[in-house]
Amino acid sequence: MLKAYERLDHTHGEIVDSITLDQDTRKKARIKGTTDGGADIGIFMERGHPLLVGEILKTECGVFVEIKGEAEPVSTAIATDWLTFCKVCYHLGNRHTSLQIGELWLRFKPDHVLEALAEKYGLSIDKTPAVFEPESGAYGGKGGHSHAHSDNISNDKHSHAHAH
């Protein structure tokens, strides 16, 4: 079994495997799973610092494993103007719910109350499963940013790791 205890800022070594995890699993400090290549892996990280999509883990035997996000049920609320978008972000933020924020779109776990609030302000709701990468919060420290560089709601990532 591979065992990973270390996150890397970057690597010049070859990333030989990956593991695809949903958001709830990425929040866990101890994960036992199977890599996308079929290897058993144990991930042992510090508590309170979720794994981020695009991060690289180094196993104790020197193998580099990339964290990938699994598409999961989400609601993506899409706005057509910035003022309305800001108002909805404000109201949903006051509910202390996990949100992923993009340009004129925000994403949250399916919740009919939150969907109704967004629709009340004229946002459309897209329920297509997607990778969920919520903001870490004002005091969250690590994470909270996307590695995507697109203005749309795509989850395409670039291939190098960042310091977190």
Model-derived segments and their meaning:
Residues 1-25, 101-102:
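Extended boundary segments
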Residues 34-42, 46, 102-103:
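Short, structured beta-strand/loop micro-motifs enriched in basic residues and often containing a Trp
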Residues 81-128:
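Conserved, well-structured core segments that form or line functional sites
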Residues 1-13, 109, 114-164:
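Helix-rich terminal scaffold detector
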Residues 42, 75, 105-109:
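A generic structural motif
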Residues 45, 51, 57-59:
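Short, well-ordered loop/turn sites that connect or cap secondary structure elements
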Residues 49-52, 65, 106, 124:
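Small-residue-biased structural context
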Residues 66-79:
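Short glycine-/aliphatic-rich beta-strand segments at the starts of folded cytosolic domains
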